[in-house]
Amino acid sequence: CSSDLIKERENSHNLQSSDAFNYWSQLHSDLAAKFDKEIEIDISDLLPQVSWGTSPEMTIAFNADIPKTSNSKKALNYMGLENEKNLLNIEFDKVFIGSCTNSRIEDLRAAAAAIKGRQKAASIKEVLIVPGSRSVQKQAELEGLDIIFKDAGFSWRDPGCSMCLGMNEDKLAPYERCASTRSEE
């Protein structure tokens, strides 16, 4: 239930006591509602996904081979990849941790815990850390997460548009590869 998800979030007490939350809580399906179809999908065996192409449907499990399809030649050429190449053998130039929707404080805490005491690999040109909002940035700095990232050789950025949109200096050069995070819920 969405309201349960909200209750798990920090500072949700402000939202839960709001008029908006009270109104939203009244919006639900009728108990006798009938739907055309209800489906349940078990994704417990789904592996992390990566994109090998230029469109969302060009996505496979991180350890899979790039499929050989008739419509992939143009995308593969653009990406500098080949059919049936395993993505585990692809080297990255940059890493991007962030985005306005996927750089919550809990995401940054998890990233900091994973890299604390480690260094950016010499083969990686740059690692960008972009907090999802100013409040996330402030909280991360209060907790010292920015120091962990900087000590690892990462770039700590201000929140805002970054590599997702590529409208500033946070862009990839042709044929550069970037590992970026997503934590869709």
List each language-model region with its residue ranges.
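Glycine-rich loop at the start of a catalytic domain that most often binds anionic cofactors/ligands
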Residues: 9-10, 141
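Generic, well-ordered alpha-helical scaffold segments in large soluble proteins
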Residues: 5, 9, 111-114, 118, ...
